[in-house]
Structures are given as C-alpha cells and as structure tokens.
C-alpha cells in the first residue's frame, strides 16, 4: 500500500491506463492527428470517425441519441451553456429560474450572472438530509418560470435527487429542466430515453477520463433550443464552436465505454467500501453523517467530527488525500456552503471531511483510513479545551466568548 492514500475521487480521478493508451493514438504524426472538420482528406475523415465513435459511446452510457451530445471543455462550460443558452433563448416566455442552494458553483455563479442581466432566480433550501422537498419546488414554479436546474448527485455530500419526478413536474408545465450529472454519470444508471430531462451536463475527469473535456446533452424530441455562448465556425451543430480536441474526446468516449461495462460491479464494490468506512468510524463520539446513506451515491461519505477543528484534522490526516468541501472552494477557510444550506452550524461544518472513493481504492486503504481517523480524532480532542468542557457537561452554546 502506497501513502498518501487518494480519497478525493470527487475532485478528480486518475486517467484509466486504458484511456491514456487510447488517447496516445490521436496525437502524433503516426497517429490520427487530423482536424475532424477537414473534409477534403483522409486525415480529417479518420479524426471525424473517431469523434463519432466517442459520441456514440457517451450516448450509449446515458441512453441518448448521439446527435444530442455536444462536446464542451468540461462540466463548468456545459452548465454555463445550458443555463445561459436556454435562458437567453426562452427569455421572451419568462425570466424566472429555479435552482437549489447546494448546486455546484458552476450553476450558482451562472445564475448569479443571469440575475445581473435581469433574470429572477429562486434558490431552494434542501431538507436536513440534502434532498429537495418537491412540494417546495412545485410551490416555487410560476407562469414565467422557464428553467429549473437541479443536480443529480451532490459533489460534497453525495445525496441523489429525484430527477425523474422533477422532470415530470417540469415537463407538465412546459419548463425546461437542466441536470448537472457530473458526479453521477457512470456511477448511477441514467436513461435519457426515459427521463424527462432536457439538458444534462457531463465531465470526463470525474470518471477516469482526461481533464478539459465534457459534454452537454441537448434533447431533440421535444426539441430544446439554446443560444450559443462560443462563436466561430459553427461546430457542434452551431451550439459550441471550436476545433474538436480529438484525443480528449476519444479519451472521454473510452472512459464512458469502460464505465458502462464495469458500473454495476464497481458500484457494488464501492458501496461496500464506503459502508465499511462508515461502520469503522460511526461509533466515535459526536460524529455526524452529512447527507443520506440510503439516498446517497455509493462512493461519497461526508462526516463531521464535533469539537475538532477542520484544518487541523486535515493536517493530522496528511497521509490521506481528503477534502473539506469541494475542490473549487477548498482554498477558502469559509465553511462549506452546502453544509450550511443544510442548516448546520459553522463549527460542525468546519469539522467536516469528505471521503470519496474510486476505482483504485482498496480494502486495505479503507482499514488504514479507519485506524488513522480514530487515532487522530482522539489525539486532537485530547488537546482541545472545548472537548474537555463538553465532557464536563458545559453547554458550549450558552457561553459568551469575549472578543479581544
């Protein structure tokens, strides 16, 4: 077993060796390096064929028509293209958008930008377990609501939203439904031929493909229109211009092909490892599970350890690559906005750790993790005056701290 142990698969994944090998065939002179938009020679045709195969591999994993897959530079761009693209195209119908407070920043910041441009956005607060109350969602829907954006799996706590029911609710009212599926694709079954979802964002690098490539699903029947955000050349049926990066697209396609083959066995294995980890630490005093094990992705475990300072905990766990919050916000010392939206106090939110497991995680690594976490929590609490006061029965919420 090698240290440090990587348990931050929700931030990014290593590229699968099978994917890397495939990508190498599309870079150099003796490979398929052509521009897929070059229609006048073989180099271009071969590149175009490689892109078509990858588009099919992605469509097959999610039950879509390959013509509904638009390549982008990643899920952040897909979220921007979906939300801005749909809002701008349908703004004559209305200017109201609904999302949730626990979405990824790529959705929240895009909505904030649209607010600056005159749109109105309702941000729903989830229930304590992170799940959106569908009655609240229904109550928020208005005649001028044009778009709902609610993710499939939350990147910090792993809870799974009921996108099938939300899709039905939106379709019944003629509202466009966008889903950020970055954390769920290849981990949970997605069948867009059955789901009433109009727009869905995907990434390559969360599922053992390369960074810098993603896709947006844009439904054809009923046809959804979006306004392009990137112009020049009219690639991707006019929705996203720019030369297609064949090696990255092929890598993403191969990663999705592998995911389709291995998803069922892999997810059962990861669920077992995640449960093993939780069962190994849940009897520590003042430990709280964030999210919902039953309605949660199989690979994410988010836990708060009360009376332990989050940053010092991460330092104590230096043999583990884990995070508190998402990678996009982990540089700030602000507590996770997702946990605060669940109604958690700052102290508890600060002491939260996200363990996210993946393809190369082993049982041995999980057992080492359990042991290290138990020792570290014990040691840090021995040093903590707050823990001592708590053990003596002092109600810490009733204390007024003096500001110097």
Curated annotation (Swiss-Prot):
Catalytic center residues:
328 (cysteine persulfide intermediate)
Which residues are recorded as binding [2Fe-2S] cluster?
328
Q: Which residues bind pyridoxal 5'-phosphate?
A: 75-76, 155, 183, 203-205, 243
Identify the pathway. Answer: Cofactor biosynthesis; iron-sulfur cluster biosynthesis
| PANTHER family found in the cross-reference section | CYSTEINE DESULFURASE, CYSTEINE DESULFURYLASE FAMILY MEMBER
Q: What does this protein do?
A: Master enzyme that delivers sulfur to a number of partners involved in Fe-S cluster assembly, tRNA modification or cofactor biosynthesis. Catalyzes the removal of elemental sulfur and selenium atoms from cysteine and selenocysteine to produce alanine. Functions as a sulfur delivery protein for Fe-S cluster synthesis onto IscU, an Fe-S scaffold assembly protein, as well as other S acceptor proteins. Also functions as a selenium delivery protein in the pathway for the biosynthesis of selenophosphate.
Could you describe the subunit structure of this protein? Homodimer. Forms a heterotetramer with IscU, interacts with other sulfur acceptors.
Q: What is this protein called?
A: Cysteine desulfurase IscS
The source organism is Salmonella typhimurium (strain LT2 / SGSC1412 / ATCC 700720)
Native organism taxonomy: Bacteria, Pseudomonadati, Pseudomonadota, Gammaproteobacteria, Enterobacterales
What gene codes for this chain? iscS
